[in-house]
Amino acid sequence: MIMRMTLTLFVLVVMTAASASGDALTEAKRIPYCGQTGAECYSWCKEQHLIRCCDFVKYVGMNPPADKCR
């Protein structure tokens, strides 16, 4: 019984985390001021207090700024 409750809680946490990151990506694609360049999109990402902005910029199809990302 405890194992089932633990598993259920784990699944809920994972689904919530996946949903939150997906919402951020959807939001950036929907909002036109993410930027015209990778540097602008990176700055927008940082202003939103998102993490992994280098990966985010790549995901939306832009090149992240070389001085900020490796």
From Swiss-Prot:
Which pairs of Cys residues are joined through disulfide bonds in the record?
C34-C41, C45-C53, C54-C69
Q: What is its main location?
A: secreted
Q: In the UniProt record, which is one GO cellular component term?
A: extracellular region
Which keywords label this protein?
Cleavage on pair of basic residues, Disulfide bond, Neurotoxin, Secreted, Signal, Toxin
Would you say which domain of life the source belongs to? Eukaryota
Kindly state the tissue distribution recorded for this protein. Answer: Expressed by the venom duct.
Q: Which residues form the propeptide?
A: 23-28
Show which residues constitute the signal peptide: 1-22
| Subcellular localization(s) per the UniProt record | Secreted
List all membrane-crossing ranges. Answer: none
Taking the record's annotation, the residue ranges forming a coiled coil are none
Please provide, alphabetically and separated by semicolons, the GO molecular function terms listed in this UniProt record: toxin activity
What role is this protein assigned?
Answer: Neurotoxin that induces excitatory symptoms in mice following intracranial administration. No symptoms are observed after intraperitoneal and intravenous (tail vein) injections.
- UniProt domain comment: The cysteine framework is XXIII (C-C-C-CC-C).
- What family classification does the UniProt entry report for this protein? Belongs to the conotoxin K superfamily.
Provide the protein name: Conotoxin Im23.3
Source organism of this protein record: Conus imperialis (Imperial cone)
